[in-house]
C-alpha cells in the first residue's frame, strides 16, 4: 500500500464501490487459501500437497474458460497443463503419493487450490477498472487481520523470543516478498490471458527443488533424473500454452 501510494503520489485507498472486490479477493486469495492450506498440510504429506497444489494451474484455466468465459479452452492449453502436472508428479515420485485420501488433509489442500484459482480469475476481472496494487495491498491487510483474529480465537498466541529482532525482520522480509510477488502476479494477469500466466505456476515445485540444492545443500536429491525430466515436462507445458494456446 505504501509503495503504491508513493508511485501514484496519493494515498492508495479503495473507494466504497471497490470494497466488495477487496473483500472477495481477501476471502479467496488469503483467508480460504491459507486456512485450508495450512490445516491440510498438517494432515497430509508434503509430496501429496505439492502434487495437488500443482493442479491449481489446471483449475485456474478451467475456471477462467468454462465458468467465467474469459478465454477459450484449447487442446494446446489442455496438453500444456497435462505436461506440467506430469512434471510435478515425476518430481514428487514417492510411495506416500499413493497413500489414502484424507478429507482434512488432501481435501483441504484441494479446496485451497480451488480458492487460489478463483482468486486469480477474480484479479483478472477486477483489474479491468481497479488498481491492482490497491487490490493486492488491501486484500492482504484485511485477510491478515481476519487470519490473526481466527488464530487468536482458536487458541494461538504471539510469543517473542529473547532476541526478537531477527524474527521481526524475517517476518517483514517474508511479508515484503509475498506482497511484491502477488502485486507483480496481479499486474501480469491484468495484461495477459489467465492461461499464459497461470501455467508458470508449474515452475514452483521445480524451483523449490533447485533452490534447495543451492541453498540447503540438497544437490544429490535435486539433480536426480526425475528432477531433470520434471523440468523438461514443465518447460514443454509452458511453451505449448504460451506459443500455441492462443493465436497472437
What are these regions (language model features)?
Residues 27, 38-39, 99-128, 133, ...:
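Glycine-/small-residue-enriched transmembrane alpha-helix faces in small-molecule transporters
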Residues 167, 202-248:
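C-terminal-most transmembrane helix of multi-pass membrane proteins
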Residues 5-53, 86-90, 174-192:
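Specific transmembrane alpha-helical segments of multi-pass solute transporters/efflux pumps
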Residues 1-32, 55-63, 115-119, 136-155, ...:
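Transmembrane alpha-helices of multi-pass small-molecule transport proteins
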Residues 17-24, 72-85, 106, 130-139:
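Cytoplasmic-side transmembrane-helix entry/capping segments in multi-pass membrane proteins
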Residues 50-53, 69-90, 99-105, 217-237:
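Loop-to-transmembrane alpha-helix entry segments
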Residues 30, 34, 49-55, 123-145, ...:
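Helix-helix packing/entry segments at the starts of transmembrane helices
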Residues 14-20, 93-115, 152-172, 221-231:
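Juxtamembrane helix-entry segments on the extracytoplasmic side of multipass membrane proteins
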Amino acid at each position: 500500500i505504501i509503495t503504491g501510494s508513493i508511485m501514484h503520489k496519493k494515498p492508495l485507498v479503495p473507494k466504497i464501490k471497490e470494497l466488495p472486490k477487496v473483500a472477495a479477493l481477501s476471502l479467496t486469495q488469503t483467508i480460504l487459501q491459507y486456512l485450508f492450506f495450512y490445516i491440510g498440510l498438517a494432515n497430509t504429506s508434503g509430496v501429496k500437497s505439492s502434487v495437488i497444489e500443482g493442479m491449481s494451474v489446471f483449475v485456474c484455466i478451467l475456471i477462467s474458460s468454462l465458468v467465467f468465459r474469459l478465454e477459450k479452452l484449447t487442446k494446446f492449453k489442455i496438453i500444456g497443463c497435462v505436461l506440467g502436472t506430469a512434471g510435478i508428479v515425476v518430481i514428487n515420485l514417492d510411495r506416500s503419493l499413493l497413500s489414502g485420501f484424507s478429507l482434512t488433509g488432501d481435501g483441504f489442500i484441494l479446496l485451497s487450490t480451488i480458492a487460489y484459482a478463483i482468486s486469480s480469475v477474480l484479479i483478472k476481472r477486477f483489474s479491468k477498472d481497479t488498481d491492482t496494487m490497491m487490490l493486492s495491498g488491501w486484500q492482504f491487510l484485511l485477510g491478515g487481520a481476519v487470519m490473526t483474529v481466527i488464530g487468536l480465537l482458536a487458541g494461538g498466541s504471539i510469543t517473542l523470543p529473547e532476541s526478537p529482532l531477527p524474527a521481526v525482520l524475517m517476518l517483514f522480509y517474508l511479508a515484503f516478498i509475498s506482497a511484491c510477488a502477488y502485486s507483480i502476479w496481479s499486474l501480469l494477469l491484468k495484461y495477459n490471458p489467465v492461461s499464459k500466466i497461470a501455467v508458470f505456476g508449474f515452475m514452483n515445485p521445480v524451483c523449490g527443488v533447485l533452490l534447495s540444492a543451492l541453498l540447503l545443500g540438497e544437490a544429490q536429491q535435486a539433480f536426480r533424473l526425475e528432477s531433470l525430466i520434471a523440468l523438461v515436462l514443465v518447460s514443454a507445458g509452458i511453451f505449448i500454452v504460451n506459443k500455441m494456446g492462443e493465436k497472437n
